[in-house]
Amino acid sequence: QFLSNYNIPSTGWVNYKYREHELICDADKKTLCDIEVIVKSKNLSKNNQINQSVSPCIVSFDIEVYSSQKNSFPKAENLEDCIFQISAVVQHPDKKIEKILFCLKPDHTEFDFKLEDAECRFYLDEGRMITGFRNFLLKLKPHLVIGYNIMGFDLEYILTRDNEKHGVNVTTNLKFQQHGFYKYKL
């Protein structure tokens, strides 16, 4: 209704009256954007001069989980039901595709190497792997994070494992709780 009332496109560019905004300080930001502002709706207008479309950076991810109970679905609360791999596919704004596998390697050697079309990053334990995935997202700052059933399983599983087993909140810097992930009680 808002877009219709103010004749603003659902995608594209908008203008706002420059002096009629409030700049948000870093501590209060709701996103990972470099700049956030609060603008009254009456100070917004459709931009007809920019025809360029946005090319977002998109990350799609999936987790692979071990179940310690035979013929049973894994439970994040079970210590043995660990995440052993996180796969991520990145589509960069220039349309370049990058594939990364975050993997457990249960010996004392951490190393990275490339497969033909994917980079593999190995970690000694699940906590380090989840932290590596978090740091990857923080550095990349994707515009969109997508995946099959990530809201119904993957994200909640990662958060539960990290909070309960490792005592680290993977979302501390990702601000998931400020993007509608309220059911995870972060």
Regions found by a protein language model. Give the residues of each.
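The two-metal-ion catalytic cores of nucleic-acid processing enzymes
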Residues: 1-186
